[in-house]
Structures are given as structure tokens and as C-alpha cells.
Amino acid sequence: MAAGSDPELVLTHEFDAPRALVFRAWTEPAHASRWWGPQGFTTVSCRMDARAGGAYRLAMRGPDGVVHTKRGVYREVTPDRIAFSYAWEDADGNPGHEMQVTITLEEIGRRTRLTLRQTGFAAVPERDSHRSGWASCMQRFAAFLAAQM
């Protein structure tokens, strides 16, 4: 893509959960492994070192049986902001094209507004595929949070 034409993805959702719970759900493997991934996907493995400079790696099996693995490095981890790189692994475990994700958490009374911003897509179809995946993931996330309340 030409410089300056990087398609970005921005999604905003409000959840009936306190920010502290939403933060833990994004930064603790025991929680993230229960919701991260689109509907129909199950977590195969989830490792997270949620601190600036720490790494994560999450493998999930799709409904077709294929395992999809993503990994990255945290750039920032604070109660109101989580920023990390995001890359899919190929069959040999090598990282693919790297993107950047920033999660912002805003307290609204007893609710939390989550804004997800992802940049660095190679093309618009890649962004659109991620939009669909994240939207499905946020449905699972909402159900996970509701079960914790």
C-alpha cells in the first residue's frame, strides 16, 4: 500500500463490568484463554507476560480444526491502556506481517468503554477480515464478563 493509506480498524464497545475486571481479562492467560478468538474457536495454548517488553502467544483451533497462532510484544500495559504488536505465525512458527493494537479502557460508572484500534494492515481486505474476527471476539468477551459478575 502507498504510504499514508494504511487502513485502520477502530471498534468501540461498552461492557457491564468494572475496568479492573476488563483489564485482568485482557492481561491474564487464565481469563484470556476463555474468550479470545471468534465464535467457534477454542484456545489451544495461551502465554502472556503482560508488561512493557513482555511477549504473548495465543494458539486457537478453528471450527475446521486448523490451528491459528498469533503473537506479539506488549509496548504498554497500564490499567487504562494496553498496546501490543500482533502477527500471525506461519506453519513453521515464523511471524508474518506485524500490526499494532491499542486497547483503551475508560470507566463509565460501573461500566467500561473499550476502544480497540488496530493499524498496519497490508490491505483493506485484511482489515475487514480482522473487523469480523474482533466483532465476534467481543461477543465472546461480553459473555465471559457477564459470567464473572
Q: Could you describe each region identified by the protein language model?
A:
Residues R113, G120-M149:
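A conserved amphipathic terminal alpha-helix motif
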Residues H13, L116-Q118:
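Short, hydrophobic/aromatic-enriched beta-strand segments in well-ordered soluble domains
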Residues S5, D16, V77-T78, I108-R110:
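Structural motif
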Residues V22-A25, A32, Y56, Y74, ...:
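Hydrophobic pocket/interface hotspot
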Residues E8-L11, A20, S45-C46, D64, ...:
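Hydrophobic/basic alpha-helical segments enriched in Actinobacteria
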Residues T27-E28, P79, A146-A147:
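Residues at helix-coil transition
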Residues S33, G37, C46-A52, R57, ...:
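Hydrophobic-ligand binding "helix-grip"
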Residues M1-T42:
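Hydrophobic ligand-binding cavity/cleft-lining segments
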